[in-house]
Amino acid sequence: MSMSYQLKTKKLACQRGDNVLFTDFNFVWNSGDFVQIEGHNGIGKTSLLRILIGLAQQREGEVFWNGIPIQTQRETFQYDLLYLGHHSGIKPELTAWENLKFYQQMSACELGEDKLWQVLETVGLLGREDIPAAQLSAGQQRRIALARLWLSKAPLWILDEPFTAIDKHGVQVLTTLFEQHATQGGIVIFTSHQDVQSRLLKKVRLENYKFTE
């Protein structure tokens, strides 16, 4: 990637109902950063990610993409973002192949069909490409969603529990992909309970309403 990118948070605070999940979240992540958000269930990790991408409202503070608040540049920010949440976001009536083809068209990805076949093989769906997603297992549906990572040109990847329903080999394949994306100038931010091993990985932990590195 020829550009440098930066995601910055300033004094973010999150409250859900009467519960304060976290306060005073100040971080700067730049091109090359590979970051894991840690913390026990229900502590606010998913809420943080949803605030970072503009899907949830913070109580206080602001999120900046390349120095500009994301609220004032939604179209640009969405173009630069790939977000994968708890739900796969795939179309159950479409096959694995059709889902990837649909994503390719929607994202204006110019990679050829050879790349689609390569990605299907990488995620272990070769031979199942013509089966409707609704008939596949949860793990296989998750792989369809994750396959979009190999097709994406977005510099910012924000991923909520990307290793869910993925075997040990799949975890290593994804970790390698995340490392490659970071070393090529992208930013990867994800939540996971997995003990991810990478020399590039930075860890941020949410505990007692605060984040620490």
Swiss-Prot record:
Domain of life: Bacteria
Molecular function via GO: ABC-type heme transporter activity; ATP binding; ATP hydrolysis activity
Annotated Gene Ontology cellular component terms: plasma membrane
Membrane topology: Peripheral membrane protein
Keyword Transmembrane helix in record: no
Location of the protein in the cell: Cell inner membrane
Catalytic function, reaction form: heme b(in) + ATP + H2O = heme b(out) + ADP + phosphate + H(+)
Coiled-coil regions listed: none
Key words, A-Z: ATP-binding, Cell inner membrane, Cell membrane, Cytochrome c-type biogenesis, Membrane, Nucleotide-binding, Translocase, Transport
Alphabetized PROSITE patterns for the sequence: ABC_TRANSPORTER_1, ABC_TRANSPORTER_2, CCMA
Start and end residues of each ABC transporter domain: 7-213
Amino-acid positions noted as binding ATP in the UniProt annotation, renumbered to this chain: 39-46
Purpose: Part of the ABC transporter complex CcmAB involved in the biogenesis of c-type cytochromes; once thought to export heme, this seems not to be the case, but its exact role is uncertain. Responsible for energy coupling to the transport system.
Stated name of the protein: Cytochrome c biogenesis ATP-binding export protein CcmA
Species: Pasteurella multocida (strain Pm70)
